[in-house]
Swiss-Prot record:
Domain comment as written in the entry: The two SH3 domains and the SH2 domain are necessary for the reinitiation of oocyte meiosis.
Primary location group: nucleus
GO terms assigned for molecular function: epidermal growth factor receptor binding; insulin receptor substrate binding
Record has Ribosomal protein as a keyword: no
Identification of the protein by name: Growth factor receptor-bound protein 2
Location relative to the cell: Nucleus; Cytoplasm; Endosome; Golgi apparatus
Origin species: Xenopus tropicalis (Western clawed frog)
PROSITE patterns per the UniProt record, alphabetical: SH2, SH3
PANTHER family for this protein: PROTEIN ENHANCER OF SEVENLESS 2B
Gene3D superfamilies listed in its UniProt record: SH2 domain, SH3 Domains
Amino acid sequence: MEAVAKYDFKATADDELSFKRGDILKVLNEECDQNWYKAELNGKDGFIPKNYIEMKPHPWFFGKIPRAKAEEMLGKQRHDGAFLIRESESAPGDFSLSVKFGNDVQHFKVLRDGAGKYFLWVVKFNSLNELVDYHRSTSVSRNQQIFLRDIEQVPQVHGGDRATNLLQQPTYVQALFDFDPQEDGELGFRRGDFIQVVDNSDPNWWKGTCLGQTGMFPRNYVTPVNRNM
């Protein structure tokens, strides 16, 4: 994930990362600490205070979903090139690109060089976002012409198992207030946190993921996030 720095930050410890307001940081790990993320900037990495940045969620980033789930979701898409990026199951901290082509789903390991740049083949990029944009017009495969295109929203199925109401494209909301869980299965968060919604079939309680945790939360505690931010 990427984040925009809201303020200047000067590191006060060897494991912290300095940055300036407006810098685009690569967030490497959101689960290290409640108040600190691990991030990278200009080939250097370190810890940054979470309240100094604003996350930039992308509709194609699905986080920690299994390879099998990615194949199931993309298998329902009509068009070749429908894709998502997910965190690698076999190599924590790395990413995989899953793309629909024909009746199959192909998986590409997103590689990184010593300077922290991302690439699939030869051309390298400073961010996943740049890599995705490039491969919208340049094939991700050397064997077929496969151009990335955003997945389509699959209409929700009313009734039946709640699992059928999972969103097929990630929708993000931002917390307006702090929410502390009162029951098992509820999702706690702090004001300003970004939440990925995975089920919005209930008018009052939605299911989402935040900082590696999944659970239910009250709809009136959040506000939609612009997909194009």
